[in-house]
Amino acid sequence: MNDLEEVIGSYHQALDQFARGDGEPVKALYAHTDDVTLANPFVGLPVHGWTRVAEALDLASSNFRDGVMSRSDRVAQYIGGDLATIVELEQWQAKVGDRQEAKPFLLRVTTTFRLDGDSWKMVHRHADPISSPNPDGPLRAS
């Protein structure tokens, strides 16, 4: 796929499969190189390199069942040369971990794609759940 928007559409479809526990479609969109990265709540610190990213994607996808990534809202995009970064809000609903009921949640996500020959490949994803502000949390001024 050489059209960036087409690749992003495939990426969103792959995330829908991810929400059902199948990480393979997302893995297929990644560049399988030593410089790729992934940061998500299941792996703690960001991981670097294809082998570790693939393992982290397997771990993360194994935590989801019976889910959907129902909506993505693009907040911003930055495209230049052979790199493109999108910032999105993703609306998910899934059974997570041992939970027996599917719950909705919102992720804030930054994804970077790189043009590899004539195809765009993912090289970075950082996803965090958005939670309610905690006035007593560690990042609040006193």
Indicate where each model-derived feature is located.
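Hydrophobic alpha-helical segments of small multi-pass membrane proteins
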Residues: V75, W92, R108-T112
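Short beta-strand edge/turn micro-motifs at domain boundaries
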Residues: T85, F105-D136
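Basic/polar N-terminal segments that are highly enriched at the extreme N-terminus
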Residues: M1-E5, L139-S142
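Generic short beta-strand segments
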Residues: E88-K95
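Amphipathic alpha-helical repeat scaffolds
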Residues: H12-D16
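A generic "structured core" feature
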Residues: G21-G23, T110, A141-S142
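A solvent-exposed, acidic/Ser-Thr-rich amphipathic alpha-helical stretch
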Residues: L4-E5, Q17, G23-I79, L89, ...
